[in-house]
């Protein structure tokens, strides 16, 4: 049973979300708002009933059984998000069942590094740590002068921060922030205006907000000067 068979009027990609806790529900609802066709799966009847109020395709099923997933046509989905977190056994068995069903790309939520390692070894192509990522983000916002912070797996980060005093009234080329701090200013926003892409000729004014990218340690050091 495949709810999203290929056809001229159907989406090019299909996505299934397994586990409809807070994280899974947020992922499924966000994907739906973005215009994607989403199949949501959970084994708890009360959760399925509640999710049916906001999602079009919701199925009650035991995702740890590969035969059940095969019946749902899970192997024909382009992406499957395993959003089961606290029940580690169910999380691992679901990833294994997805792998056995031939899912091409498996995203899985992990609650810690050891859980993530097991998921990778079981067949997950991508592992995310939403609680850790949010904790890291909030820690940077609370302890530093950043307005926003996003870190990637490879030690690369993007931050939103106020313009440092040394750059005000100068072009980015004149202030030489890149050579001094090893970061790249990719966008500048004046109060009340939209962000614009930064160039060496962009003039930084007092009150401007900068979008800066670079190695995590370098953008942290740069943000501390603002």
Regions found by a protein language model. Give the residues of each.
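Cytosolic regulatory regions of ion transport systems
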Residues: 1-226
């Amino acid at each position: 049973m495949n709810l999203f068979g290929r056809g001229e009027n159907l989406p090019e990609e299909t996505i299934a979300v397994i586990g409809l806790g807070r994280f899974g529900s947020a992922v499924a609802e966000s994907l739906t708002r973005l215009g994607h066709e989403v199949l949501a799966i959970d084994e708890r009847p009360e959760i399925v009933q509640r999710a049916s109020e906001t999602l079009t395709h919701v199925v009650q099923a035991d995702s740890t059984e590969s035969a059940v997933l095969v019946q749902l046509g899970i192997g024909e989905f382009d992406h499957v998000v395993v959003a089961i977190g606290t029940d580690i056994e169910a999380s691992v068995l679901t990833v294994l069942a997805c792998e056995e069903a031939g899912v091409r790309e498996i995203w899985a939520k992990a609650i810690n590094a050891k859980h993530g390692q097991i998921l990778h070894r079981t067949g997950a192509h991508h592992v995310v740590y939403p609680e850790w990522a949010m904790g890291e983000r909030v820690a940077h916002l609370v302890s530093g002068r950043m307005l926003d912070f996003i870190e990637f797996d490879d030690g690369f980060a993007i931050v939103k921060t106020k313009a440092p005093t040394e750059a005000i009234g100068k072009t980015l080329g004149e202030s030489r922030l890149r050579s001094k701090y090893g970061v790249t200013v990719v966008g500048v926003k004046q109060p009340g205006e939209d962000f614009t892409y930064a160039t060496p000729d962009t003039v930084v004014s007092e009150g401007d907000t900068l979008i800066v990218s670079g190695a995590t340690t370098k953008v942290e050091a740069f943000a501390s000067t603002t």
